[in-house]
Amino acid sequence: MSGAGPQAPDVFLLQGSRGALYAAYFPPAPGVTSRGDVLYCPPFAEEMNRCRAMASLQARALSALGVGTLIVDPYGTGDSAGEFVEGTWEQWREDLAAGIQWLRQHGRGCIGLWGVRLGAVMAAELAVRDGAIPNLLLWQPVLNGKQFYTQFLRIRIAAELEQADGIKSTDELRKLSAAGQPVEVSG
């Protein structure tokens, strides 16, 4: 049989400021000149779950080109510590910054950030704050936060359409959120 196939990622727990974070590092393929590493900045909520397989496929493709990829589940997501409702933008930014530091400490350095949807916004913010990351790859970046939030809330509306007493508008959900109430959207 020829070829070993794709290399399995190195899976480990990265220490975040509030607990252990699931991390998977896809190193550059053996025999390929290393070009450095990128950090994947995932999309938000259900979009993150729907993109997991694609992110792994892309990380393997980058590996074949000599680019390592670190995928981190921020606090309260995936297999990381915490509950989703406890996560904040600031917390997730800190968690991804810990990923950048991990890449720097392990020799190849962080040459770029790869962000998908709302993760693209996070990647741009991280790059500006860090000041030393030369490359950004932004897939389908969110350009209008209000529109994104409305689309996100529509997931909940769709789930309640058949219920007579269900929430019927994104305005109702916005009012709950503005009052400090948690709004469950999709589980």
Q: Which sequence ranges carry the predicted segments?
A:
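An N-terminal hydrophobic leader/cap segment in hydrolases
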Residues: 1-31
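Gly/Ala-rich beta-loop-alpha elbow adjacent to hydrolase catalytic centers
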Residues: 114-123, 140
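Alpha/beta-hydrolase active-site loop signature
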Residues: 45, 74-79, 143
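Active-site signature of alpha/beta-hydrolase-fold catalytic machinery across serine-
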Residues: 125-129
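Structural motif
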Residues: 36-39, 112, 135
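Short, surface-exposed "cap/lid" segments of acyl-processing enzymes
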Residues: 18, 26-73
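Catalytic nucleophile-loop/oxyanion-hole region of alpha/beta-hydrolase
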Residues: 77-110
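The alpha/beta-hydrolase serine catalytic core
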Residues: 132-187
